[in-house]
Amino acid sequence: MNGLPRVGLGVDVHPIEPGRPCWLVGLLFPSADGCAGHSDGDVAAHALCDAVLSAAGLGDIGDVFGVGDPRWEGVSGATMLRHVVELITQHGYRVGNASVQVVGNRPKIGWRRYEAQAVLSRLLNAPVSVSATTTDGLGLTGRGEGLAAIATALVVSLRDPLGSQ
């Protein structure tokens, strides 16, 4: 570990499952259908998990929360993010900041952006930016068949002055 900040990228995509609760960016959107998945289907939380794990050099979400492990079945994205923060802390890192962009038509998240940023920032103990975009009708997100998220995270060493709080 050289003490320099490290950057990671995470991507997650899930199909929409009619009738399933919609958890996205750490929030429940009661009027929208949610995503299928082993856990709660929160693509934004999952992409953030991948980005943080990647930045810390600890693999990816599949390594930590494998679909074959019943302990993680139905677990919330919030629980997953808390676990990832514990893991990177054990390995001498903390999150410096993160950003996540949701790709899809629905639910619209703009009106809850600041609430989402507050929830995710609290979970990661760091500033988190939230944004959204569409694919102008192209692909599975454009046809409303699924949602995707792309995230970046910067982690810093707890053992280096740059990582001091």
UniProtKB/Swiss-Prot annotation:
MF GO annotations: 2-C-methyl-D-erythritol 2,4-cyclodiphosphate synthase activity; metal ion binding
Site (Transition state stabilizer) location in chain: 38, 134
Keywords from the UniProt entry: Isoprene biosynthesis, Lyase, Metal-binding
Pathway: Isoprenoid biosynthesis; isopentenyl diphosphate biosynthesis via DXP pathway; isopentenyl diphosphate from 1-deoxy-D-xylulose 5-phosphate: step 4/6
SUPFAM superfamilies: IpsF-like (SSF69765)
Family annotation (Pfam families): YgbB
Entry's Gene Ontology BP terms: isopentenyl diphosphate biosynthetic process, methylerythritol 4-phosphate pathway; terpenoid biosynthetic process
Coiled-coil features, chain-numbered ranges: none
Domain of life from the UniProt record: Bacteria
First and last residue of the signal peptide: none
EC nos: 4.6.1.12
Family stated for the protein in its record: Belongs to the IspF family.
UniProt name for this protein: 2-C-methyl-D-erythritol 2,4-cyclodiphosphate synthase
Organism, as annotated: Mycobacterium marinum (strain ATCC BAA-535 / M)
Lineage of source species: Bacteria, Bacillati, Actinomycetota, Actinomycetes, Mycobacteriales
Gene: ispF
